[in-house]
């Protein structure tokens, strides 16, 4: 089983980490092409393109300027430790045992606008470039055109090494769109997380994002390779709801929080 996650906008480059053997991203040369184009943008261009404040735009112009093809532990951090949003709050890598992190390296891929796809321990320099950004480049009008089949091909290679080739989609729609699922030639499972509110079950973005991270954690902690075992997921009081589930869209529900 291979999990795909979305990245996070929030980054943490301050908290220390211990990783014996960090790895390098697969598509550094492709990232460098994007950086070359991003370096041409003025802060006001970045602000307009990405809908950022002047302060955040200036921060990211600096990041593009400082980005280097050489990844070191001084300018980079393993992706799974660097991302700091709701998904990664749920995953909580800092409390995982080394063996679980090792399993994650083989069974998780993080989709990225700048890096294409990252393994958890791939060194990553800080950036902001969401996959849905309409950033014109030599290959087309946006990042989906830029990455083409590259990310899909990378995942296909990783899936071919899996004992049970199944893609567990814990990414957002924006990021999953970079893939061509049919070309993966394997089942794709996209769990749905619903919370009760005002007497109805619905997807609440903040909770759903965190639940994706929790499920990724559940998989790596329990070394799950068979999708049937996902039904046992019960972290943070979520429970499998068979009546609403489909094979490719298992539904997990949680009663209203008080």
Curated annotation (Swiss-Prot):
Coiled coil: none annotated. InterPro entries: YaaA. GO terms for cellular component: cytosol. Pfam families: H2O2_YaaD (PF03883). GO terms for biological process: response to hydroperoxide. Belongs to the UPF0246 family. HAMAP family: UPF0246. This is UPF0246 protein Pnec_1068. It comes from Polynucleobacter necessarius subsp. necessarius (strain STIR1).
């Amino acid at each position: 089983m291979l999990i795909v996650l979305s990245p996070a906008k929030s980054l943490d480059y301050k908290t220390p980490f211990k990783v014996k053997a960090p790895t390098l991203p697969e598509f550094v040369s492709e990232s460098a092409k994007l950086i070359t184009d991003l370096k041409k943008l003025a802060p006001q261009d970045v602000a307009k393109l990405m809908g950022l404040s002047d302060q955040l735009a200036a921060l990211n112009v600096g990041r593009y300027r400082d980005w280097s093809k050489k990844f070191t532990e001084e300018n980079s951090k393993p992706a799974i430790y660097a991302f700091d949003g709701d998904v990664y709050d749920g995953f909580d890598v800092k409390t995982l045992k080394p063996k679980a992190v090792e399993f994650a390296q083989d069974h998780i891929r993080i989709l990225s606008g700048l890096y294409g796809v990252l393994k958890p321990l791939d060194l990553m320099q800080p950036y902001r470039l969401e996959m849905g950004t309409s950033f014109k480049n030599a290959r087309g009008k946006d990042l989906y055109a830029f990455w083409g089949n590259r990310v899909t091909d990378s995942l296909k290679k990783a899936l071919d090494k899996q004992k049970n080739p199944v893609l567990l989609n814990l990414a957002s729609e924006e990021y999953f769109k970079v893939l061509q699922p049919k070309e993966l030639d394997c089942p794709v499972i996209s769990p749905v997380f619903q919370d009760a509110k005002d007497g109805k079950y619905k997807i609440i973005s903040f909770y759903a994002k965190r639940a994706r991270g929790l499920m990724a954690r559940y998989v790596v902690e329990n070394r799950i390779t068979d999708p049937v075992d996902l039904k046992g997921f019960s972290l943070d009081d979520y429970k499998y709801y068979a009546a609403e589930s489909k094979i490719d869209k298992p539904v997990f529900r949680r009663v209203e929080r008080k």
